[in-house]
C-alpha cells in the first residue's frame, strides 16, 4: 500500500510539472529571458529553500546540513550547473517541437541517462559505497521499457512531422522544426540527467534519523537547483543585455500579472521534485523503485505532457494512426512505472 501511495505522490508531482508551461502562456509583454529567470527565482531558489528547511529538525540550523559534506555539496552544485544547461535547451526543444514531443524526447533521454549516470559516477568517487549494485536487472528493465515508450512517442512525432503541411505544423507549434528540435532535445536530455547525478552526490546531506525519510532528498534538491539557477541567470541576463529587454522588469502595467503566473509556474515545476522526495519516503522498502524513482518521474512527466499536448491541440490534423502510436507510447510509459516491482 505504501508503494502505491509513493507512486501516486510522484505521479501528482509529474502532473504538476507537465502543467507548469500553461501559466507561462498567461505572461504578458515580457521576453523569454525575463519571464524564464523570474519563474526560476521561485522554482529554483525560494521554493527549494523552503523545502530544504523541512529537513532541518527543531534545535538545528539550516547551515548545519552541510557540515562535513564539503565535497558532496560542491559536486551536487556542479551537476546542478550542468543541469542548468539542460534546462535552457529544454525550453528550446519545446519551442521547435511543442510541449508534447519536446518534453517526451528530452525527458526520455534524461530518464535513462540520469538513472544510470548517478550510480556510475558515484562509484568512481566513492567505490566503497558499491553504488553500481543498485543497477539491478529490474532497474535496467525499467529504464529500457521507459526508453521504448519514449521511442514510440518519437515515432509518433516523426509521423506527425511528415504528414502535416507547413501551415498545419506552424498552426500547432509556431516554430516547428523537427531535425533542429530533435538535436536540441537530445542535448537537453543528456544535460538534464545531471540533476539525478547531483541528487546521488547529495543523498546523505540531511540529519539522519532526525530527518523524516520523505524530506531527505530536499536539501540535495535545493543545492542542484541553486546550481541550475546560476547557469540560467547568467544566460538570461546576457540575453537581457543583448536584446535590450531589461525594461521588462520595469513594466508596472504587467508586473503583478506576470509575477503571479511566474510564481505559479515555478510552484508547479518544483512540485515534481518535492513530490519525488515525498514519494521516495514511501518507497524505502523497495530498493529497485528507490533507484528508479527519478526515471519513473520523468516517464510520468512525458505521459502528462502528451496529455497536455492533446489538450492544447498540438496533435491537431494528425491521422488516427499517428494518434494510435502516440497512445501506445503513453501506455508503455505507464507500464514502465510499476513493471520493475512485478519482476
Regions found by a protein language model. Give the residues of each.
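Polytopic alpha-helical membrane proteins, predominantly small-molecule transporters/carriers
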Residues: 1-343
Amino acid at each position: 500500500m505504501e508503494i502505491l501511495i509513493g507512486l501516486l505522490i510522484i505521479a501528482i508531482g509529474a502532473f504538476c510539472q507537465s502543467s507548469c508551461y500553461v501559466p507561462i502562456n498567461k505572461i504578458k509583454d515580457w521576453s523569454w529571458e525575463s519571464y524564464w529567470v523570474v519563474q526560476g527565482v521561485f522554482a529554483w531558489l525560494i521554493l527549494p529553500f523552503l523545502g530544504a528547511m523541512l529537513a532541518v529538525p527543531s534545535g538545528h540550523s539550516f547551515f548545519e546540513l552541510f557540515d562535513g559534506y564539503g565535497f558532496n555539496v560542491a559536486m551536487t552544485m556542479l551537476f546542478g550547473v550542468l543541469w542548468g544547461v539542460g534546462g535552457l535547451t529544454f525550453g528550446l526543444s519545446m519551442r521547435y517541437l511543442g510541449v508534447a514531443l519536446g518534453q517526451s524526447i528530452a525527458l526520455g533521454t534524461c530518464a535513462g541517462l540520469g538513472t544510470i549516470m548517478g550510480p556510475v559516477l558515484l562509484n568512481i568517487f566513492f567505490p566503497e559505497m558499491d553504488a553500481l549494485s543498485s543497477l539491478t536487472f529490474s532497474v535496467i528493465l525499467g529504464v529500457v521499457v521507459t526508453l521504448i515508450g519514449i521511442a514510440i512517442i518519437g515515432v509518433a512525432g516523426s509521423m506527425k512531422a511528415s504528414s502535416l503541411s507547413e501551415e498545419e505544423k506552424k498552426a500547432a507549434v509556431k516554430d516547428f522544426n523537427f531535425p533542429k528540435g530533435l538535436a536540441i532535445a537530445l542535448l537537453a536530455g543528456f544535460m538534464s540527467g545531471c540533476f539525478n547525478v547531483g541528487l546521488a552526490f547529495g543523498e546523505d546531506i540531511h540529519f539522519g534519523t532526525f530527518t523524516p525519510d520523505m524530506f531527505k532528498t530536499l536539501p540535495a534538491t535545493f543545492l542542484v537547483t541553486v546550481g541550475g539557477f546560476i547557469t540560467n541567470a547568467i544566460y538570461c541576463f546576457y540575453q537581457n543585455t543583448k536584446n535590450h529587454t531589461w525594461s521588462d522588469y520595469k513594466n508596472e502595467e504587467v508586473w503583478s500579472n506576470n509575477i503571479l503566473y511566474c510564481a505559479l509556474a515555478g510552484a508547479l515545476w518544483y512540485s515534481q521534485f518535492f513530490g519525488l522526495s515525498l514519494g521516495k519516503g514511501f518507497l524505502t522498502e523497495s530498493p529497485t523503485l528507490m533507484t528508479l524513482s527519478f526515471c519513473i518521474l520523468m516517464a510520468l512527466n512525458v505521459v502528462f505532457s502528451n496529455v497536455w499536448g492533446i489538450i492544447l491541440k498540438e496533435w491537431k490534423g494528425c491521422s488516427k494512426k499517428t494518434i494510435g502510436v502516440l497512445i501506445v507510447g503513453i501506455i508503455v510509459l505507464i507500464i514502465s512505472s510499476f513493471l520493475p516491482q512485478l519482476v
